[in-house]
Regions:
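An N-terminal hydrophobic leader/cap segment in hydrolases
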Residues: 1-45
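Alpha/beta-hydrolase superfamily serine-hydrolase fold, recognizing
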Residues: 31, 39-45, 51-324
């Protein structure tokens, strides 16, 4: 339960519409973080046509860095797309999150600097993410890894991009993701009074991320209203969800996006995919960017590591049986 005092504070902070410049300046304050984690990092790039897509690699150990840039390594990798409503945030702002992710999972983390709306509307941010994923899966980055050891992960708008990249990869057939992790993903297309989801109505005004702000984000991301019907814009619009990766979805109890993420998980499962969905009790949208001392973050990494380790074990058993 949330105290009355905390609820009053949250309500006071949950007001207004999205103003792009001020929202970006506020997000950039994260770069002043005095508790930043210093890991071995490497900046590289992928290409979406003629456009360079910067990526930053985070290595949990010296050994991982040496192995990661040696051809043929099987060190596991998380390909990460950051949140921010497709409008704010950056690789630099998510530096601590990605460093902690590398430490907590013992994975190399590859964070993608996709272009932002409204300067670059749908599908440009998605195509940047897809290009980075394709480069990683086909060993066109400086990092060489086993595609079976890659997991795509994203939070909020990054969860949307993760789901959309996996749909696009299935449809285009250029590479095959085996796992995706969606952290409070934005997979719907409506946050008005017409929304079918209870969480939009219950949590859409008092818990930092509001329904009004979500509508603003969608309006800034879309080219026209028609985009909202596109499954690559709103994965919940996809009617055929077969043949998608093993999926872990984490939602937050006090998040307007909670129900749509859980519904997406159920639809994936009905379509025959292996899916785990966990609701983090007492959590708000955005909690994953908090420090590791927060219990909600610790709980999330227990689910993430359990999902990753179980998937690797199943795949190893399958690979062993296929060689007999």
């Amino acid at each position: 339960m949330i105290s009355k005092t905390m609820k009053t504070v949250l309500h006071a902070l949950s007001y207004g519409n999205i103003e792009v410049d001020s929202s970006r300046k506020l997000a950039d304050l994260k770069q002043l973080d005095a508790t930043r984690i210093f890991l071995k990092k490497l900046d590289a790039r992928a290409y979406n046509g003629d456009h360079e897509v910067p990526v930053r690699l985070y290595f949990p150990t010296e050994e991982a860095m040496e192995a990661g840039i040696a051809e043929g390594t099987t060190f596991p990798v998380l390909l990460f797309f950051h949140g921010g409503g497709w409008v704010t945030e950056s690789v630099e702002n998510y530096d601590r999150v990605c460093s902690r992710m590398a430490q907590s999972t013992a994975h190399i983390v590859v964070s993608v600097e996709y272009r932002l709306a409204p300067e670059h509307k749908f599908p440009i941010p998605l195509e940047d993410c897809y290009a980075a994923a394709k480069a990683l899966y086909t060993n066109q980055l400086i990092l060489h890894t086993d595609p079976k050891k890659i997991t795509i992960i994203g939070d909020s708008a990054g969860g949307n991009l993760t789901a959309a990249v996996c749909l696009m990869a299935r449809d285009r057939g250029e590479f095959t993701p085996r796992r995706q992790i969606l952290i409070y993903p934005a997979v719907g297309n409506c946050y008005t009074e017409e929304s079918p989801y209870r969480s939009v109505h219950e949590n859409g005004s008092d818990y930092l991320l509001t329904a009004v702000k979500m509508e603003d984000y969608l309006n800034l991301y879309q080219r026209t209203e028609e985009d909202r019907k596109n499954p690559y814009f709103s994965p919940l619009q996809e009617k055929d969800l077969k043949d998608l990766p093993e999926t872990l979805i984490l939602t937050a109890e006090y998040d307007p996006l909670r129900d749509e993420g859980e519904v997406y998980g159920r639809k994936l499962e009905v379509a025959g995919n292996r899916v785990e969905v966990h609701r983090i009790r007492g959590a708000f949208h955005g909690f994953f960017a908090l420090g590791i001392k927060f219990l909600h973050v610790q709980e999330s990494f227990r689910f993430i590591n359990g999902f990753l380790n179980d998937s690797y074990l199943r795949n190893n058993i399958l690979a062993s049986s296929e060689t007999k």
